[in-house]
């Protein structure tokens, strides 16, 4: 009888310790995901090409990519991005001449390319870290820079005004800094 009690006590202690371990891992996972999940907007963007560019057609070329992009008078309104437990999507801005296909006048507009990200939580002992991948866009470089902040570097192709109603395509690297605007629960 005493032996059965001891065995039951040992089994009970083992069950409690196993359930505590799972709760502890869940807490680590949640804390890691809290650093990244949410709704984001672009805070700044830098053109990393050899020469400054003029996306908005004002005649002033700049390396301030995001300011140039915002200066384009037409195009998408919502350029926010959203990250959650398993990943999310990040909108990368670029410019495009919508009339180039049919030979119409230059009409450069703002566009975004949505890139999908996968987030994985790696638990190693008492530490948790996040790993990020972009299965459809292997050229994306992602850096988690702080709580609710990250940068993305990607090569983009943009249309730039070339003066007198002409345009040309330019391809180069851009680095964008994103900042969380609102926390997202899931």
Predicted regions and their residues:
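Bacterial Sec-dependent N-terminal signal peptides
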Residues: 4-5, 16-44, 178-186
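Sec-dependent signal peptide hydrophobic core
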Residues: 7-12
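Generic short beta-strand segments
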Residues: 41-50, 120, 124, 151-162
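Contiguous, well-ordered beta-strand patches that form the walls/edges
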Residues: 48, 71-151, 179
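Acidic, glycine-anchored loop motifs typical of Ca2+
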Residues: 53-62
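Mature soluble binding/inhibitory domains
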Residues: 61-63, 67, 73-76, 178-184
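Edge beta-strand at a domain terminus
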Residues: 148-186
């Amino acid at each position: 009888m005493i032996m059965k009690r001891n065995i039951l006590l040992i089994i009970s202690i083992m069950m409690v310790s196993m359930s505590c371990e799972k709760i502890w891992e869940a807490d680590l996972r949640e804390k890691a995901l809290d650093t990244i999940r949410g709704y984001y907007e672009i805070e700044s963007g830098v053109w990393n090409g050899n020469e400054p560019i003029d996306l908005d057609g004002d005649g002033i070329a700049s390396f301030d990519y995001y300011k140039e992009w915002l200066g384009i008078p037409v195009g998408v309104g919502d350029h926010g991005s959203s990250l959650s437990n398993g990943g999310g999507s990040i909108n990368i801005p670029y410019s495009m001449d919508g009339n180039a296909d049919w030979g119409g006048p230059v009409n450069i507009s703002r566009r975004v390319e949505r890139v999908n990200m996968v987030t994985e939580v790696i638990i190693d002992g008492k530490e948790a870290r996040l790993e990020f991948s972009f299965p459809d866009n292997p050229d994306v470089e992602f850096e988690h820079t702080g709580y609710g902040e990250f940068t993305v570097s990607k090569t983009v192709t943009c249309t730039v005004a070339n003066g007198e109603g002409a345009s040309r395509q330019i391809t180069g690297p851009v680095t964008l800094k994103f900042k969380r605007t609102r926390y997202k629960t899931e």
